[in-house]
């Protein structure tokens, strides 16, 4: 169970200092500690429209984000408040309150546009807050939406036409919620009641015509319809008599307009119930560290004069996380091998079987923690590191076996060596006595368990080192005839040749086992990669089908409204999505 992060109040995430956007390191520390998936709700709107009040309500607090009580905008840059999600256990709600747009004292439309774009890029639900009704003035104030293609890139290498790039916006843009404060109209058309959502859709209807006025009317509406196919609207009555509005957060509930209280409750309930976890392309859920990386990547891009690019942000994040995934996988492998392996192992195959089990688990850890591993670069690194660690364990195993056998030989054959020095076998019949004793000790050595894979080789080398002793005893033993000595020499040669042959077979067997293990390792990498790619492909297809359904829905609306040309333009986006879905075939080229 991941620990909860519950900030007592908001803190600055991105400062707007002298026209420069600067990330607050303390806020990044908070984000880096949030291991839970995050639901990110951002609110944007003109200054002094009561954005902060709604965000405090979402946090379940009366105070928090600064409301201010004058015509001056209080919030500067983007402020963040992280609280446990009240309706989704094991999730963190991240609320982003933004600097009021259109502040006359600030007079910086450039920064307003960047704050608007950042709020969209960072959130899973984007709330646009405005006063009164949705009229042309309200649409004109929302001109930032028409500038999104000049502020955001979906891909690092889009086509020649920026509109082609913007066609991908839908796949990672947030849900759009328009909140209308101090709304005084009756929600009805031709005497029939309508919902706030109906009112929004009616307000987004296009005007026929190709003149400049029609274009100005249609452009923001088209952008909202194109970029935010999932949209919602809430209207709010006056919260209280005008004289109390400056101190809204201090009012008791009974002093507020009951309709306003009900409307705020409905808004909060919807946002908390329907706002999704922030995701990256392919449905990858965002947690605190991932959100931290997105903030840094986007703000750094803006500061360096580039456009924030979703693809670049994801790839930068993938580099960080995939590198960490390799480290996690290797740590898991070493932990498992440390627990399971007792050196020396009786056979090489015993060690390789333990390696294979630990390797399989390590690859699983990597697959679970990695994403967007372009050309399987990090999986290749993992494979190389696992192979190096396997070889290291093999070396350790050989050394442990050699050390064990050398100590055992000293223990078993030490007394025999002492007898040789004392001349015990330097007498007639001594050679026979020596070879008999040697065979007894060899049998004793063979019977000792868990000597490891070097047992035969260490014994062979030891016996070879004592051949001069045996030969001297043979040649000086007066009880043996020259013929018997010659026969014994030939027997020793044959025995040595047989031992060498067996050693060669043993080495060949080890090489075959290593080659077989390498093939099994490769197949395990391929198997798990194929399964992951299939899961990713299914996720991407589901995401594209969802986007396609929303595009088709919008196309149908345009046709019903009689805007055939706009429908045809949208058809290109639809074809692009359909072609991409067809091309989503798993490709597996690794190692």
UniProtKB/Swiss-Prot annotation:
<dbReference type="GO" id="GO:0050830">
    <property type="term" value="P:defense response to Gram-positive bacterium"/>
</dbReference>
<comment type="function">
    <text>Interferon (IFN)-inducible GTPase that plays important roles in innate immunity against a diverse range of bacterial, viral and protozoan pathogens. Hydrolyzes GTP to GMP in 2 consecutive cleavage reactions, but the major reaction product is GDP. Following infection, recruited to the pathogen-containing vacuoles or vacuole-escaped bacteria and acts as a positive regulator of inflammasome assembly by promoting the release of inflammasome ligands from bacteria. Acts by promoting lysis of pathogen-containing vacuoles, releasing pathogens into the cytosol.</text>
</comment>
<keyword id="KW-0399">Innate immunity</keyword>
<dbReference type="GO" id="GO:0000139">
    <property type="term" value="C:Golgi membrane"/>
</dbReference>
<feature type="binding site">
    <location>
        <begin position="181"/>
        <end position="182"/>
    </location>
    <ligand>
        <name>GTP</name>
    </ligand>
</feature>
<dbReference type="GO" id="GO:0071222">
    <property type="term" value="P:cellular response to lipopolysaccharide"/>
</dbReference>
<dbReference type="GO" id="GO:0042802">
    <property type="term" value="F:identical protein binding"/>
</dbReference>
<dbReference type="GO" id="GO:0048471">
    <property type="term" value="C:perinuclear region of cytoplasm"/>
</dbReference>
<dbReference type="GO" id="GO:0031410">
    <property type="term" value="C:cytoplasmic vesicle"/>
</dbReference>
<dbReference type="GO" id="GO:0042803">
    <property type="term" value="F:protein homodimerization activity"/>
</dbReference>
<dbReference type="GO" id="GO:0140973">
    <property type="term" value="P:positive regulation of AIM2 inflammasome complex assembly"/>
</dbReference>
<keyword id="KW-0929">Antimicrobial</keyword>
<dbReference type="InterPro" id="IPR003191">
    <property type="entry name" value="Guanylate-bd/ATL_C"/>
</dbReference>
<dbReference type="GO" id="GO:0042832">
    <property type="term" value="P:defense response to protozoan"/>
</dbReference>
<dbReference type="GO" id="GO:0051607">
    <property type="term" value="P:defense response to virus"/>
</dbReference>
<keyword id="KW-0342">GTP-binding</keyword>
<dbReference type="GO" id="GO:0005829">
    <property type="term" value="C:cytosol"/>
</dbReference>
<dbReference type="InterPro" id="IPR030386">
    <property type="entry name" value="G_GB1_RHD3_dom"/>
</dbReference>
<keyword id="KW-0391">Immunity</keyword>
<dbReference type="GO" id="GO:0003924">
    <property type="term" value="F:GTPase activity"/>
</dbReference>
<feature type="domain" description="GB1/RHD3-type G">
    <location>
        <begin position="35"/>
        <end position="276"/>
    </location>
</feature>
<dbReference type="GO" id="GO:0030659">
    <property type="term" value="C:cytoplasmic vesicle membrane"/>
</dbReference>
<keyword id="KW-0488">Methylation</keyword>
<feature type="modified residue" description="Cysteine methyl ester">
    <location>
        <position position="588"/>
    </location>
</feature>
<dbReference type="InterPro" id="IPR015894">
    <property type="entry name" value="Guanylate-bd_N"/>
</dbReference>
<dbReference type="InterPro" id="IPR027417">
    <property type="entry name" value="P-loop_NTPase"/>
</dbReference>
<keyword id="KW-0832">Ubl conjugation</keyword>
<dbReference type="GO" id="GO:0006955">
    <property type="term" value="P:immune response"/>
</dbReference>
<dbReference type="GO" id="GO:0140678">
    <property type="term" value="F:molecular function inhibitor activity"/>
</dbReference>
<dbReference type="GO" id="GO:0042742">
    <property type="term" value="P:defense response to bacterium"/>
</dbReference>
<keyword id="KW-0547">Nucleotide-binding</keyword>
<feature type="lipid moiety-binding region" description="S-geranylgeranyl cysteine">
    <location>
        <position position="588"/>
    </location>
</feature>
<dbReference type="GO" id="GO:0005634">
    <property type="term" value="C:nucleus"/>
</dbReference>
<dbReference type="GO" id="GO:0071347">
    <property type="term" value="P:cellular response to interleukin-1"/>
</dbReference>
<dbReference type="GO" id="GO:0005737">
    <property type="term" value="C:cytoplasm"/>
</dbReference>
<protein>
    <recommendedName>
        <fullName>Guanylate-binding protein 2</fullName>
        <ecNumber>3.6.5.-</ecNumber>
    </recommendedName>
</protein>
<dbReference type="Pfam" id="PF02263">
    <property type="entry name" value="GBP"/>
</dbReference>
<feature type="propeptide" description="Removed in mature form">
    <location>
        <begin position="589"/>
        <end position="591"/>
    </location>
</feature>
<keyword id="KW-0968">Cytoplasmic vesicle</keyword>
<dbReference type="GO" id="GO:0034504">
    <property type="term" value="P:protein localization to nucleus"/>
</dbReference>
<dbReference type="GO" id="GO:0071356">
    <property type="term" value="P:cellular response to tumor necrosis factor"/>
</dbReference>
<dbReference type="GO" id="GO:0071346">
    <property type="term" value="P:cellular response to type II interferon"/>
</dbReference>
């Amino acid at each position: 169970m991941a620990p909860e992060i519950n900030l007592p109040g908001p803190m600055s995430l991105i400062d707007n200092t002298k026209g420069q956007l600067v990330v607050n390191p303390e806020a990044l520390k908070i984000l880096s500690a949030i291991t839970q998936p995050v639901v990110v709700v951002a609110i944007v709107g003109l200054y002094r429209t009561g954005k902060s009040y709604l965000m405090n309500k979402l946090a379940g607090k009366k105070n928090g984000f600064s409301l201010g009580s004058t015509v001056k905008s209080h919030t500067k840059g983007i402020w963040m408040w992280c609280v446990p999600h009240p309706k989704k256990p094991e999730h963190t709600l991240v609320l982003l309150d933004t600097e009021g747009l259109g502040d006359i004292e600030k007079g910086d439309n450039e920064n307003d546009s960047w704050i608007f774009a950042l709020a969209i890029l960072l959130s899973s639900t984007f709330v646009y807050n405005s006063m009164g009704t949705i009229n042309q003035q309200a649409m004109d104030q929302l001109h930032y939406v028409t500038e999104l293609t000049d502020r955001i890139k979906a891909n690092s290498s889009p086509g020649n036409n920026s509109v082609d790039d913007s066609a991908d916006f839908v796949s990672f843009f947030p849900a759009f919620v328009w909140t209308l404060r101090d709304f005084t109209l009756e929600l009805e058309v031709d005497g029939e009641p309508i919902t706030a959502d109906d009112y929004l859709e009616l307000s987004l209807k296009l005007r026929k015509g190709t003149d400049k006025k029609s274009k100005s009317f249609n452009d923001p509406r088209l952008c909202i319809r194109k970029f935010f196919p999932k949209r919602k609207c809430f209207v709010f009555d006056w919260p209280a008599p005008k004289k109390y509005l400056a101190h809204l957060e201090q009012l008791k509930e009974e002093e507020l307009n009951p309709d306003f209280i009900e409307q705020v409750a409905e808004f909060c309930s919807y946002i908390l119930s329907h706002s999704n976890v922030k995701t990256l392309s392919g449905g990858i859920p965002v947690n605190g560290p991932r959100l931290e990386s997105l903030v840094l990547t986007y703000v750094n891009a803006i500061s360096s004069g580039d456009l924030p690019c979703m693809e670049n942000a994801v790839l930068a994040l993938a580099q960080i996380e995939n590198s960490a995934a390799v480290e996690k996988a290797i740590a898991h492998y070493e932990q498992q091998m440390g627990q399971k392996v007792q050196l020396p192992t009786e056979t090489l195959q015993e060690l390789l079987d333990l390696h294979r089990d630990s390797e399989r688990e390590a690859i699983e850890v990597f697959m679970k923690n990695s994403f967007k591993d372009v050309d399987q670069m990090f999986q290749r690194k993992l494979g190389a590191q696992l192979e190096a660690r396997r070889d290291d364990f093999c070396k350790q195993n050989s050394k442990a076996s050699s050390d064990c056998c050398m100590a055992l030989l000293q223990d078993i054959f030490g007394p025999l060596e002492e007898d040789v020095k004392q001349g015990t076998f330097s007498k007639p019949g001594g050679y026979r006595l020596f070879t008999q004793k040697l065979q007894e000790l060899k049998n004793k050595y063979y019977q000792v368990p868990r000597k490891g894979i070097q047992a035969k080789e260490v014994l062979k080398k030891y016996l070879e080192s004592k051949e001069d002793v045996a030969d001297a005893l043979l040649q000086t033993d007066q009880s043996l005839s020259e013929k018997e000595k010659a026969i014994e020499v030939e027997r020793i040669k044959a025995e040595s040749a047989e031992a060498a042959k067996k050693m060669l077979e043993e080495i060949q067997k080890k090489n075959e086992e290593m080659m077989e293990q390498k093939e099994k390792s490769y197949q395990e990498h391929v198997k798990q990669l194929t399964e992951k790619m299939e899961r990713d492909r299914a996720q991407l297809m589901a995401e594209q089908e969802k986007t396609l359904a929303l595009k088709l829905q919008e196309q149908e609306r345009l046709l019903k409204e009689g805007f055939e040309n706009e429908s045809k333009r949208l058809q290109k986006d639809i074809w692009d999505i359909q072609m991409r879905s067809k091309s989503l075939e798993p490709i597996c080229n690794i190692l």
